[in-house]
Amino acid sequence: MAVVTLAELLEAGVHFGHQSRRWNPKMFPYIYAERNGIHIIDLVQTAQLLTQACDFVRTASEQGKSFLFVGTKRQAAAVVAQEAERCGAYYVNQRWLGGILTNWFTIRTRVERLKDLENKEESGYLDQLPKKETAILRRELEKLRKNLDGIKTMKRLPDLVVVVDQKRESTAVQECRKLGIPIVSILDTNCNPELADIPIPANDDAIRSIKLILGKIADSISEGNNGKVSSDQEDTQELQTVQ
């Protein structure tokens, strides 16, 4: 059974692609038509692939798998954080630091630094330091929060990654492919569907489009885990060295 109707997709503007001159020919099978120089996405396929993606993440969630949402563009940032938190997924919504996945142990030291500074802030320790030192540490804290807050509780690599705007998040996609982590990706008409395990052809610029699709995926993850946080957030097992 489809998780979304064509009417919902139309209302959210999911069918609007990029200018036809910016297209990736590999998206041809998912394009319905061209109107005034704009590619129109085939929403029948969008609905089918979104349903497939939701079934996939629901099953993974039932198995206790962990998820990472990635979307750093302005239109996606707030929605990515909101929907990830709602279903117990991790997220990166400001800046993808190279090596978050392929060099996780190094990134994890920065996560530990973030936790340390937050503990010092909560305890009042920072306020006891000289003003100049306090200002430096608070700037460091805010920078770490901005980039790492969504993966602060992540103790090992995610089992599945959900990407908004494949072209913008190309580094994240490359890292996933290198490590063999499955990718569910919202793809506009300028993207390459071959780089996603489950491509979802859709407008990746409109907030309503992003929210509709991520919302359906988050709903399915929540259904799979019955509203529980994914098991690895409580997993203290150390990750084996990433080759």
Curated annotation (Swiss-Prot):
PROSITE patterns: RIBOSOMAL_S2_1 (PS00962), RIBOSOMAL_S2_2 (PS00963)
Family to which this protein belongs: Belongs to the universal ribosomal protein uS2 family.
Compartments it resides in: Plastid, Chloroplast
Lineage: Eukaryota, Cryptophyceae, Pyrenomonadales, Pyrenomonadaceae, Rhodomonas
Name this protein carries in UniProt: Small ribosomal subunit protein uS2c
Keywords: Chloroplast, Plastid, Ribonucleoprotein, Ribosomal protein
Span list, region Disordered: 224-243
Signal peptide per UniProt: none
GO terms (BP aspect): translation
NCBIfam families registered for this protein in UniProt: rpsB_bact
GO cellular component: a single term: cytosolic small ribosomal subunit
Main location as per UniProt: plastid
